[in-house]
């Protein structure tokens, strides 16, 4: 008989909600455990089977920690601002707030149907004014400290979508959404000065228990480089430009210089003969995103300006080119090219037949760039020196002659924070007619996003908010000065930068969260989510957290102590699940056909949590069969508890029980859920062979099962005669002395070849082993007619008989 999952799951989900089983108590002195999921964007498509993988992992840890005596904070909320809801509103004319609310209701229903132990009293929604009041408050603090500023920046403008797109949202010159053409144009944008935190964001990674691959991605994104700035004069003019290089020691090998097509000097230095070619190239580059321009695999393109720079080291004239791989927004927007010792410069030089001059020995620079160390040649006062010494000497020379200076640069750019969109947090700033700007005072927050039917882009590059005249235009009640509200909104990242803080104190009207509660719960103990957020979300959240630490709001320097990335669940054909491929598996269907416990068990048993694994219907069926076996072991056909249950402990199942408690606990704590589940299966196999089921062991088993299959475990716990929930029962402990084997297997060898395997007492000494080996029937046969010359016995391992 199999269990009726629909009935059991509904019953216990209602019980948990009605009894607020997982509501967190602040009033106790238990140790804390804060388990956080990356909260979802509530899309119209609903939950897919990839979501519950991470959620089940944090839920297992949360349920186990409660039973281990921890006070557990395990919340859920919605990252609900964003482009898809706005696009839906544009396409249908419906209100994005209404659409978002329906999606959230659907997500909540789906998540509750999977039995996760969230404290629903702490649910948050980034589009709720009581929430974004504090997102806006943080922005005003950044503004006060000079970390939020307005700048003219070249951006990816998409006329069809009427908004600016991040580099990551542009593919091959077209928008990721809809495939519309994208062009580069300068625009007034809000920026956040994340670069002010670059060194701390880098250094503090060392203390975090995060996957090394994610730390490396952040290190590369921040991209700290040490080197020098070198100043070049432009021949025949008073103009100069500066380049940053990590290899100032190769200055004598510079063959040409390259400016970004947008560089401010390009127009001034281009000769009349080259003007047409330069203008055409500049126009062509405008349609490309930064990611495309810096793609290492693409063929190098560029145009000569007709102008020459003067090498400060030797007075040589270097032709100045423009090329799209140099970005105005990165470094100084200019590079000195040393083709003999830089791969990209070498490729460019080969395409355009530019000279290649070796200045470091060790390679064949006719064939390829040599980037290793070696003795300097053709380098004046650096000749004979190795790289490190030559760099030091060149920097000293540059500083002495005022031709340059030592410099540290970062790949990290300031964060482009504004969006020309409606569905986001309004930026709480007013621009006055006298040219000044002020932040909206804290007592006037939240600055509410006004309702409007006019969500289409304004077309001017401003957001649709610019169309709402009565909202935009303001008058200062004290001075009568007229002003305009900022019409840009915040990016979707804003609300997710600090949501983990609001979960700690979600209803507080006076503070982002109370200092006492932040002190109690921070940092987050485990944060589980997809690796696609490795850089942006995690870096932005760390930046805001460090800022809040600096202004005394939070007590820790870092938000997330341990981070774990679950793998991806692929379609049965090993391809990524997507609507277009028609291979998306809907959890609602699985909950209906197999049950939530089966889905949870299957997703944890598929393989290691961090691996990407293909969905398998037969694997799902196997998970259900195991739960049915568990049910049948405990419950008779008539629905009553089996008569095999005996009171207390006893020797039956003793060893496998203690082994199961040990292995499940260790594996769950290490997030090796698949191996923990394997051990639960071992226990059930042994239990089926037993004539009696000692209550202590089977109750312990139900507790071990409960984090994975909570509905089934609650039902079995009730059938075992208990009232109330299993959620706060004590986690089982194991006795190490019960794990010691009474018997061990040894091998018996004859002249070094294995002839038999024997089970012998674990404490058998050499003499006993010799006797046991010789008494074995198989060994006797092999020894017939032979004389024993020597017996070597190793207790617990083997007996080797030498005979001829």
Curated annotation (Swiss-Prot):
Annotated localization: Cytoplasm
Motif residue range(s): 'KMSKS' region: 576-580
CDD domains: Anticodon_Ia_Leu_BEm (cd07958), LeuRS_core (cd00812)
Motif 'HIGH' region in this chain: 40-51
GO cellular component terms listed in the entry, alphabetical order: cytosol
Record PROSITE patterns: AA_TRNA_LIGASE_I
Top EC class for this record: ligase
Catalytic activity, reaction form: tRNA(Leu) + L-leucine + ATP = L-leucyl-tRNA(Leu) + AMP + diphosphate
A GO biological-process term: leucyl-tRNA aminoacylation
Gene3D superfamilies: 3.10.20.590, HUPs, Isoleucyl-tRNA Synthetase, Domain 1, Valyl/Leucyl/Isoleucyl-tRNA synthetase, editing domain
Any Pfam family: tRNA-synt_1g
Main location: cytoplasm
EC number: 6.1.1.4
Residues binding ATP, per UniProt: 579
UniProt KW keywords: Aminoacyl-tRNA synthetase, ATP-binding, Cytoplasm, Ligase, Nucleotide-binding, Protein biosynthesis
Molecular function terms from GO: aminoacyl-tRNA deacylase activity; ATP binding; leucine-tRNA ligase activity
Family: Belongs to the class-I aminoacyl-tRNA synthetase family.
Full protein name: Leucine--tRNA ligase
Organism listed in the record: Bacillus velezensis (strain DSM 23117 / BGSC 10A6 / LMG 26770 / FZB42)
Gene designation per UniProt: leuS
């Amino acid at each position: 008989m199999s269990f009726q999952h629909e009935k059991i799951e509904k019953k216990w989900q209602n019980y948990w909600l009605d009894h607020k089983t997982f509501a967190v108590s602040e009033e106790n002195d238990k140790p804390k455990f804060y388990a956080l999921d990356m909260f979802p964007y509530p899309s119209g498509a609903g939950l897919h089977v990839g979501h519950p993988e991470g959620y089940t992992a944090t839920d297992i840890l949360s349920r186990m920690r409660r039973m281990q005596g921890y006070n557990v904070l395990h919340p859920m909320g919605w990252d609900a601002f964003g482009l898809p809801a706005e696009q839906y509103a544009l396409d249908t004319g419906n209100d994005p707030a209404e659409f978002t609310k329906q999606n959230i209701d659907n997500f909540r229903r789906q998540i509750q149907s999977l039995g996760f132990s969230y404290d629903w009293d702490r649910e948050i929604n980034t589009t709720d004014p009581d929430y974004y009041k504090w997102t806006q408050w943080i922005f005003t603090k950044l503004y006060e400290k000079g970390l939020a500023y307005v700048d003219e920046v070249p951006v990816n403008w998409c006329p069809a979508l009427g908004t600016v797109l991040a580099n990551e949202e542009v593919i091959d010159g077209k928008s990721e959404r809809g495939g519309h053409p994208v062009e580069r144009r300068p625009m007034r944008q809000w920026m956040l000065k994340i670069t002010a935190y670059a060194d701390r964001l880098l250094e503090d990674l060392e203390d975090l228990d995060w996957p090394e691959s994610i730390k490396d991605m952040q290190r590369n994104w921040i991209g700290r480089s040490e080197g020098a700035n070198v100043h070049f004069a432009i021949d025949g003019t008073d103009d100069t430009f500066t380049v940053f290089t990590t290899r100032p020691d190769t200055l004598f090998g510079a063959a040409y210089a390259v400016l970004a097509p947008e560089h401010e000097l390009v127009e001034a230095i281009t000769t009349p003969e080259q003007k047409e070619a330069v203008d055409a190239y500049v126009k062509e580059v405008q349609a490309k995103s930064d990611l495309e321009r810096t793609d290492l695999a693409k063929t190098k393109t560029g145009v000569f300006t007709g102008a020459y720079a003067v090498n400060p080291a030797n007075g040589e004239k270097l032709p100045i080119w423009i090329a799209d791989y140099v970005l105005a927004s990165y470094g100084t927007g200019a590079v000195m090219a040393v083709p003999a010792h830089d791969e990209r410069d070498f490729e460019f030089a080969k395409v355009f037949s530019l000279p290649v001059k070796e200045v470091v020995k060790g390679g064949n620079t006719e064939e390829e760039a040599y980037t290793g160390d070696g003795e300097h040649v053709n380098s004046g006062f650096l000749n004979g020196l190795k790289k490190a010494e030559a760099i030091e000497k060149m920097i000293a020379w540059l500083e002495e002659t005022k031709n340059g200076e030592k410099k540290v640069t970062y790949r990290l750019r300031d964060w482009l924070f504004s969006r020309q969109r409606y569905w986001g947090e309004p930026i709480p700033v007013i621009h006055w007619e006298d040219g000044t700007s002020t932040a909206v005072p804290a007592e006037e927050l939240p600055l509410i996003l006004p309702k409007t039917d006019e969500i289409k882009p304004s077309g001017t590059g401003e957001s649709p908010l610019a169309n709402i005249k009565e909202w935009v235009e303001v008058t200062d009640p004290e001075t009568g000065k007229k002003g305009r509200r900022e019409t840009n909104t915040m990016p979707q990242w804003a609300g997710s930068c600090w949501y983990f803080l609001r979960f700690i104190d979600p209803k507080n009207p006076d503070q982002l969260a109370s200092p006492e509660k932040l002190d109690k719960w921070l940092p987050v103990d485990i944060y589980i989510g997809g690796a696609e957020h490795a850089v942006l979300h995690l870096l932005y959240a760390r930046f805001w957290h460090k800022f809040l630490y600096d202004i005394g709001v939070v007590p820790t320097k870092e938000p997330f102590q341990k981070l774990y990335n679950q793998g991806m669940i692929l379609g049965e054909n090993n391809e990524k699940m997507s609507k277009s491929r028609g291979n998306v598996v809907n959890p609602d269907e699985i909950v209906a056909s197999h049950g939530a416990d089966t889905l949870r068990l299957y997703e944890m048993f598929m393989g290691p949590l961090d691996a990407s694994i293909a969905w398998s219907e037969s694997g799902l069926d196997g998970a259900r069969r195991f739960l049915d076996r568990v049910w049948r072991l405990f419950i008779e056909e008539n629905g009553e508890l089996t008569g095999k249950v005996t009171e207390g402990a006893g020797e039956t199942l003793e060893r496998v029980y203690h082994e199961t408690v040990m292995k499940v606990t260790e594996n769950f704590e290490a997030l090796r859920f698949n191996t923990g589940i394997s051990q639960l299966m071992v226990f059930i196999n042994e239990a089926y062979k037993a004539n009696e089921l000692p209550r202590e062991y089977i109750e312990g088993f139900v507790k071990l099962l409960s984090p994975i299959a909570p509905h089934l475990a609650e039902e079995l716990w009730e059938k075992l005669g208990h009232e109330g929930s299993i959620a706060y029962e004590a986690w089982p402990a194991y006795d190490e002395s019960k794990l010691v084997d009474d018997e061990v297997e040894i091998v018996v060898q004859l002249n070094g070849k294995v002839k038999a395997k024997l089970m012998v007492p674990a404490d058998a000494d050499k003499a006993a082993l010799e006797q046991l080996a010789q008494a074995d029937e198989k060994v006797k046969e092999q020894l017939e007619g032979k004389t024993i010359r020597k017996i070597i016995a190793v207790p617990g391992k083997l007996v080797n008989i030498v005979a001829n």
